[in-house]
Amino acid sequence: MKKYNIINLLLLVMAFAGTRCSEDYLKPRPLSFYAPENTFVDANGFNSALIACLRNARHEYYEDTPPFVSEMIFSDVAVEGTTDKTGIHMDMPAVILPDANMDYGDVTKLGRYWTEAYNRIKYANVVISRIDNADWTNKEAQRNNILGKAYFHRANVYYRLVHQYGDVPFILEEITGPRLDFYSCTRESILQKCKKDLEFAAEYVFTDAEGALTGDINKAAVNHLLTKVNLALGEFDDAIASANAVINDGVHHLMTTRFGSAKNDPTHDIIWDLHQEENKALVENTERIWLFVCSETMTEDGASEKLRIMRQAVPYWGGANKNKTPSGQTGTTDQPLGQKVGGYPVEIDLVGKYGRGIGRVRPTPWYQHGLWDDPNDLRHKYPNWMTMENLVYNNPVLKATGDIYYNAPVRFRDAGGGLLCTDTIRSWFDWPHYKLFVIDPTDNTPDGGFGDWYAFRLAETYLLRAEAYLWKDDATSAAADINAVRTRAGAAAYPVASVNMDILLDERARELYYEEPRKTELTRIAYIYAKTGKTCYNGKTYTAANFGTDNFWYDRCIEKNVFYRDNVQAPFYKYRIAPYIVLWPVPSSAINANSLGHLNQNLGYPGFDTNVPPMKWVDGEGEGSIVEQ
């Protein structure tokens, strides 16, 4: 198995441009061997910048309170569940503001999307701008592979930015000196440039067979992203073609037979195999397209940056007094095996079996229950899927005092109907154990360890192609793709007559929970409804002119997410969203620092009234140009 070796990664020092003076002694000279002039002279130098792009992309999922949490809670599938904090993202209109601290400890990392995006763009643009500084004689394929990967990284970032923030600054070249003159650029033209770049990349980026390493960008990853961009542009035939380039490449196939470390264990199944971290990078896993690779040897990135996914998305089941027995005693503890609680050692190791969660990503009742329509669906069956009733009361004090509820299943209510869980938001919900359980042998209270994570997977490619067919009113083809994913999980196929966007989004939620950037994808679909004017499954039509006040993203969230629909009360806030939050606010810090240009603010936020017409990208020589509309 080949993995990207990014041990001891040398972070590059980007030199500023030199002075205009002509005296030779005033010309800046690199003070380091690793200055750009010395680094970007061959494939190894350019790949070092691309490795930095991969590293920054991985940061979305890894560490505590990863930015990805925001993609979950600004959607129909989940809400922020840490009820013991202030400043968290529950009452969205009150806290989602341009000058709010969006990168704050264990409260939120939403702001990382803006800063990390432009870091990745910086690294990609260095490669793009300097690619021909090297001698590529007899190495044209290597040059084009590297350039194509840089185009991929830049396009991937902008695909996310335009569905999080809308119109944003579009930077197409290496910035070699201070600049304060950026302007917002139209989402549509940014996507057009991304499409052009990805079409180049789809031609030249290597396949795995041609030498692409596990964890690096390959041709299939390019075509997968190109499919999303084609959808976003409303170019549905092109989306089908780019999805076909992955699905029909002869290499990638949905996994339907057991494989990996537990393939002979009859208590598990193909769904379990597919999501075990030790199986994701295996050669026989033909469903993997692009994988974030993580191991304890990657010390250059900080050993603490584990995939702390159980901490984020498993309930806070072991909190003190969170789940009481019918006899009124503390029922559960997340202390490890042998640790004393109340003077007695823990004998039932729940934390080792399920992980220590804090309930930050709290799935909605719809995701837990209403979404699932087939009892044979492996994704919603034990032991892949866990309910709180699968846990038992393990507090050793119960055993020591002869309490009859020791080792009995945890209960939500007592015989009289009284609640036994003191925090039903944070400490009581179901979860997809098969996907979220990532062991950490170095931690006796594991909350997620060093593990690989899917960035792109073939199941999503099928669902993207199904979506393109739906936009073209080809329900027969859409049903075939949805059912390919669905029947692999043991669920019955949908009849063609029942298939629509609601069904498609439901299947995405079942298959891609904590994989897809749910907010981004819902916003992309909202834009398509506004652009095409097609009638939605909810009976509504949408327009671009009213996007900030009436859009599909908001309607979908209100339809499926009872917390936002009913303004559920938490200890410090009510859960609320608003239509304009379909786009996040451009940070005030970015706007204020840009004193010689103008960054527009989105509707609904302070500063919107000072907006000016955004610029647009037009095709032309080199990277094209950013011009006034």
Map each language-model feature to its residues.
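Bacterial Sec-dependent N-terminal signal peptides
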Residues: 17-41, 155, 194, 227, ...
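Long, intrinsically disordered, low-complexity segments
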Residues: 21-25, 117-120, 193-195, 263-338, ...
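An aromatic- and glycine-enriched ligand-binding surface/loop that stacks and positions planar moieties
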Residues: 22-88, 230-405
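Conserved, well-structured interaction surfaces
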Residues: 38-51, 55-66, 84-165, 185-189, ...
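C-terminal substrate/ligand-recognition segments
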Residues: 351-485
